[in-house]
């Protein structure tokens, strides 16, 4: 009998009523093969599937669970808020408190607008940048993903990479023509775009750490160079911190790498596990947003009281002294241990990591710093490694193009168990 018989049954059932059996493509395990695990519950650093098996979790709901699963402060905040009502469609005090906390923690954000997802945040920020500058074109980077808005699904990164589709059908060429795709970590490609369209580019949008082609940090000159080019040509710099915000550092990767954006997009951790996104930045730019300005954006559930309570509780905990030091130390321990184990078993491996993010690349290269480097990695070897680790009770992202995430709920014993499991798996590759 299969070890995952209930997951297999549920997956077959789901495929009859949900496209592909999942509500987000990467969950289908298309990137690694096999049947996706159906999860019954989660606690701390662990997931528990419907067949009763426990896994050390390095997906963390794709980033939000920086405190670990089912954190009592967040759980209690949600229960308390739910007792007062689920949605009002009107302003609340918690929205104000949440906005004040976000702008306090991320100093480049003078003002912030709450939305319901990272996609909404990036889509709205780009509309705002276009409206503020009165320009149409945007620059994004090959292999970077900023949600599934039409103008951004151009050489988009993980979602598309996992499925082997660099572009999505259904995106008209007329939409995509205003999206200029440059090479991550290559300032020359950005200079060329600005030289070709010096007065037409509204903004650059960038993941400060590219977490949707696994985990690729910026080269030292890259983010400052983008800031300088935006200043030179009158474009806005949008830093997409949906993944890195409150994880790489308390004030995000922009703080870690010392770069000042005009607009910042947030998601994942900001909701503590609830569906929350946000975008914000310079006061004069945000003033162009409705109802004070002409750029329209709205949402029935934006600022939802349950989501705001969860987010406020999460950010309050994340901002405690020592959280990010612990997160970094645990990630460093995992990265060093995996590299050592791989070396012992003669497996060529590169591990990129920053803050509470990490990426594993099966490659003979000495480093991975670009989309081209990522595409040279051994995806088939990753697939085998993923399933071997799953059998060992370790849940990694089911795609060679997705970052891994640490939480402060992971213990050093969890990390050591993971390293020991990886050593056994490396020996079988």
Swiss-Prot record:
Domain of life: Bacteria
Isomerase is among the record's keywords: yes
Gene Ontology, cellular component aspect: cytoplasm
Transmembrane segments: none
This protein's UniProt keywords: Cytoplasm, Isomerase, Porphyrin biosynthesis, Pyridoxal phosphate
InterPro entries tied to this protein: 4pyrrol_synth_GluAld_NH2Trfase (IPR004639), Aminotrans_3 (IPR005814), Aminotrans_3_PPA_site (IPR049704), PyrdxlP-dep_Trfase (IPR015424), PyrdxlP-dep_Trfase_major (IPR015421), PyrdxlP-dep_Trfase_small (IPR015422)
Cofactor(s) it depends on: pyridoxal 5'-phosphate
Molecular-function GO terms, alphabetical: glutamate-1-semialdehyde 2,1-aminomutase activity; pyridoxal phosphate binding; transaminase activity
Modification N6-(pyridoxal phosphate)lysine, positions: 268
GO biological process: protoporphyrinogen IX biosynthetic process
EC numbers on record: 5.4.3.8
Gene3D superfamilies: Aspartate Aminotransferase, domain 1 (3.90.1150.10), Type I PLP-dependent aspartate aminotransferase-like (Major domain) (3.40.640.10)
Pfam families for the chain: Aminotran_3
Pathway: Porphyrin-containing compound metabolism; protoporphyrin-IX biosynthesis; 5-aminolevulinate from L-glutamyl-tRNA(Glu): step 2/2
Subcellular localization(s) per the UniProt record: Cytoplasm
Entry keyword annotation includes Cytoplasm: yes
Cysteine pairings via disulfide bonds: none
Major site of localization recorded for this protein: cytoplasm
Catalytic activity: (S)-4-amino-5-oxopentanoate = 5-aminolevulinate
Subunit structure: Homodimer.
Family: Belongs to the class-III pyridoxal-phosphate-dependent aminotransferase family. HemL subfamily.
HAMAP family the record matches: HemL_aminotrans_3
Protein name: Glutamate-1-semialdehyde 2,1-aminomutase
